[in-house]
Structure formats: structure tokens, C-alpha cells
Amino acid sequence: MYRLRMHAILLGIAFLTATAALAQTGEAPHKNEIGLVIGATETPSIGRIAGGEIDLDSSLALGAEYDRRMFGEHTTLYVGVDFLASPADVKVSYPSPDVSPEYAYLFLSPHIKVKFNSTRTLQPWLSFGGGYADFSPTATKNGDVNVKGRGDSGTLEFGGGADTRPLIQFKGVPLLKNLPIGGRFEVRDFYSGQPHYGVETRGNLQNNVAFTGGLLIRF
């Protein structure tokens, strides 16, 4: 599972970067943005009906994001899609034998985004969307007990962040040399169903809060 997810993430990032490079032409206004981000996802503790809580460790998060500017000059409206996945899996801290000990996640979420001060150096924004969440176990056995962690659901996504104007150019790198590259810093919550932890929990939804930052490519 780990290798499959890593291959999917790397292929997706390579495809988006190549698409941006090939689409770059002249001095036309940039209507498209691709964000390549890395960070961590935090999930609050999950309460158990039998008592106690399921505590989850932070997990590495890798993401790719595409946005298309629809209209606006200083305040602009974008539509796009977010992809976020965990190449390193979410682990339960000190899991009991009946709890699924770890799982991987994947979120794919179309969204709308409103960006402010689009012509300034620092450009704050807010986004809202919804899509698909997938949870897959990487270990289905904890001790002598078989547990399952697989599950999928819908997700609501809401968050905010800030982009910067272009800061660097890779002039000596083929394909990338003409692309203006800025920075992106963001916090997003993917509010979704839960993976199957193997025990009954209080409620069936959870917050998956991603803190990420990285490069923003415009073309």
C-alpha cells in the first residue's frame, strides 16, 4: 500500500508539473495554479463507547492542488481540486488489541477559492469544497487479533492560507525555466467519515486537519 500510494503521488506531481511547463507561453496572464505541498495531518482523539479514547499520531502529508481563475482582478474566484494523501501512515498511539493500529488516507476534493489582494506580495485566501475520502489499513492484525481499518466516505473541505507572488525561477532547469514560482502556506480541515477502527466509537465523523506548505507554480 505504501509503495502504491508513493507511486501515485509522485506520478501525479510529475504530471502536473510537466503540464504547467508545456502550457507556459509568452507573457499572457496566468490563469492556472498548481500547488505542490508537504506537511502534517492532525486528527483529534476519537472517543470509544466502551470508554477511553483512540489517540492518533501526526502523519506526513503530501499534496497536489490545481486551481483555475474564473474572474476577478484584486479579489479573484478560482475553481479547482485538491489531492492529499499519507505516504507514511496514521498510527494509533499505544493501540489496544481490538483497535486497528494504523491506516492510510487519501482525499480528493473539488473546491472553490476566493483570493484577496491578488496583485500584492502576500495573497490570503479562503476555500470550501467537498469530495471523496478513502481509508486503507496497512496492518490488519494487532497481536493475535485481526482488525480491519478500511473505509471510504464523502468529505467536506474548508480552510484558508496565503500565497506569495513569484519568488524564484529555475532558469537552468529544462521545462521549469519559464515558470514563475511562489510559495503557498495553508491549513485545511477534511471533515469526513471514520475508518473502521475495529471498535464502536462515539459518532462516525472525524476532523483531519492538514498543515501544509510548498511551491506554487503559475502558468
Residue ranges and their predicted role:
Residues 1-30:
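Cleavable N-terminal export/targeting peptides
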Residues 23-70, 212-218:
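Short glycine/proline- and aromatic-enriched beta-strand/turn motifs that initiate or cap beta-hairpins
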Residues 32-36, 77-81, 106-108, 122-130, ...:
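Transmembrane beta-strands of outer-membrane beta-barrel proteins
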Residues 38-44, 68, 83-89, 130-136, ...:
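Transmembrane beta-strands of outer-membrane beta-barrel pores
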Residues 45-52, 90-97, 136-145, 195-202:
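Outer-membrane beta-barrel translocator domains and adjoining extracellular loop/strand segments
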Residues 60-142, 153, 167-170:
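Gram-negative (and chloroplast) outer-membrane scaffold detector with strong preference
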